[in-house]
Amino acid sequence: TFGSKNIDKISAMDADLIPELFVLYQNYPNPFNSTTRISFDLLQDATLSLYVTDATGRIKTAFSDKELYNSGKYNFDWNAESFSTGVYFFTINAEVEGYLPILFSRKMIYLK
């Protein structure tokens, strides 16, 4: 009927369809002047790509490109002195065998 829910519960199998791979934190400081820190926790071993793009999607800095990382906490410092002020995005792409890739981005603002 109209307005009634279609799914009563999520099965344990459905919960495994999207693995908990990482936690991507907001860069600090944000907004920033010249340098900012990008941090993430990796909850299980994965192949990662981590990069910074401008507002049009062009990659400005690639920290890693399909490299294998062990679980743990990671920090990357990005120096933007050679770039224009504006909005940038940092993106992590994680792949674990048996799952589709997971892509997550956050926005940061560079001010001079």
Language model features by range: what are they?
Residues N27, V52-K60, Y88:
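Short, glycine-anchored, charge-dense loop/turn motifs used at functional sites
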Residues T1-N6:
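Surface beta-loop-beta hairpin patches that serve as ligand-binding interfaces in beta-rich domains
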Residues L42, L68, A80-F83:
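Residue-level recognition of secondary-structure-to-loop junctions
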Residues N70-Y74, S84-V87:
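A glycine-anchored, Pro-Gly-centered beta-turn/N-cap motif
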Residues K60-Y69:
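Solvent-exposed serine/threonine-rich low-complexity stretches and specific carbohydrate-binding patches
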Residues T56-I59, K73, Y99-L100:
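Residue-level signal for well-ordered, solvent-exposed loop/turn and beta-edge residues enriched
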Residues K9-Y28, F32-V52, N75-W78, N93-Y99:
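Glycine-centered coil/turn sites that cap beta-strands in beta-rich domains
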Residues A12, E81-K112:
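C-terminal tail/sorting-segment detector
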